[in-house]
Amino acid sequence: MLQVIKRNCEQVNFDKSKISDAILKAMKNGSGIVKPKIAESIASEIEDECRDKQEVSISDIESMVYDKLITKKQRLTAKAYEGYRSIREF
């Protein structure tokens, strides 16, 4: 099972629902338009990209989320997501 390395170096099992939940929160706080299909699609794409890895860092996942939001023309959501990420890293 894919392991995620958190900021405190703890390892946890990969859970794509955490990714989609974070995206949905960013959508609500960014554009105010919540699009569950886009959030689920991004989470699934990241899961597929990481499938062959044994571990991935939370910062790598966050970068992938941000890039995919931009690619899917979700700029306001990406900005809200990036703001949340900056606070967490601080």
Give the positions of each predicted feature:
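Long, C-terminal-biased catalytic regions of enzyme "large/alpha" subunits
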Residues: 1-90
